[in-house]
């Protein structure tokens, strides 16, 4: 626009000069004789003009343009423009290039967003792998060869993704480089774990598989004259040599009152006349871990699993988790005392309430880690039992066989095992089995007392548990299972017996 303005100003100046010169010349011709020489003509130039050269033209410079009038009075103007005109075509190309670059930037930016999301996803997977590897480091027995293969496969997938990101990503790759280093470290760690295998778990398992194969071959080729392995004892029978092992726990259900009710007991009612009866009872204590106020009955295990078809009852006099059911009766330690109460499961009425002679109560000699269980009631194939301690026994376990109808004591045995050092106990075929805590995940059946022979001794049967504390253990003679109340969860264990009956001494 500035060049156009300059051109117009120059043109106006030239036209103005020419018109004034013409008027002046005409006026001079009217008043005087026209000059015959260039010198005379020069006298009539406009004010501010320069002298005209003889026989030629005189230029009048103004800014960056010049104007002149020749000898005939004709105005001539010249305007000095830049060497090149305004580059409109180059500006248009620049705008087009900028548009193309903007589109490319948008595409690359969208890729960056996708990469960021992918990095976030794989970062979470990497954290998950880290946790799994840490678990494998802490508990080497829990992992398998398949675990290694799955982890290595996932790490390889992440390595491929990182390489793809580095190939396609333009700009700073600092985050991707860090992720690649972490994945490389994870790969080395998994390979190190697999190669070290500190407990030789994988090699041992391979050897076990090989041994099992050989064992099957031996069994297939052995003579038919070899007598078969004797079957397990019949339900409710004592034709065996005692407990020699125990299965892994089966989690049946959380107690019906919820996770906060960590203390209590549960089991299956046993009746020698009707051993197949499937009446299950659950008796969680109140949150004070002392008072037994409510219990629930289920007619089958299926109903217990889905909390269906149950009967709820309320009592106000139970104490501790030493409860047991026998012959359609519930036996409990009476609240704040040394009595035992017999409650009819059909009517919820107390039929008998009788003191257990000399029994300590109210946490005098309770189990380790469990309060208010000074008196623990138990059932086996033979009778109803009371497991407790007295001042006369100096806290050692006392076993009494009870009349399940009158609650009178029939026989009593005093052991050498201190009751507060025991975490819990149960009876099988007249033999007391006591447990102790090894750690937060393991109990041990470490002690037994046989009332049939009055012999006692040590055992080493490990017993896994789901939670830290075991509150009660009840044995059922017909299904030969332990019913364990473990921090609010209802667990089942199968007992394994020695096939050869124990010889009396």
Curated annotation (Swiss-Prot):
Example of a GO biological process term: cell adhesion
Glycosylation sites: 64, 128
Location(s) in or outside the cell: Secreted, Extracellular space; Mitochondrion
InterPro entries reported for this sequence: Olfac-like_dom, Olfactomedin-like_domain
PTM info: N-glycosylated.
Major place of residence: secreted
Disulfide bond sites: 238-429
GO CC annotation terms, alphabetical: cytosol; extracellular space; intercellular bridge; mitochondrion; nucleoplasm; perinuclear region of cytoplasm; plasma membrane; protein-containing complex
Database matches in Pfam families: OLF (PF02191)
Olfactomedin-like domain location: 237-499
PROSITE patterns per record: OLF
Single GO MF annotation: structural molecule activity
Keywords (A to Z) from UniProt: Cell adhesion, Coiled coil, Disulfide bond, Glycoprotein, Mitochondrion, Secreted, Signal
Signal peptide coordinates: 1-18
Free-text function comment from the UniProt entry: May promote proliferation of pancreatic cancer cells by favoring the transition from the S to G2/M phase. In myeloid leukemic cell lines, inhibits cell growth and induces cell differentiation and apoptosis. May play a role in the inhibition of EIF4EBP1 phosphorylation/deactivation. Facilitates cell adhesion, most probably through interaction with cell surface lectins and cadherin.
Domain note: The olfactomedin-like domain is involved in the interaction with cadherin.
Protein name: Olfactomedin-4
Organism: Mus musculus (Mouse)
Gene for this chain: Olfm4
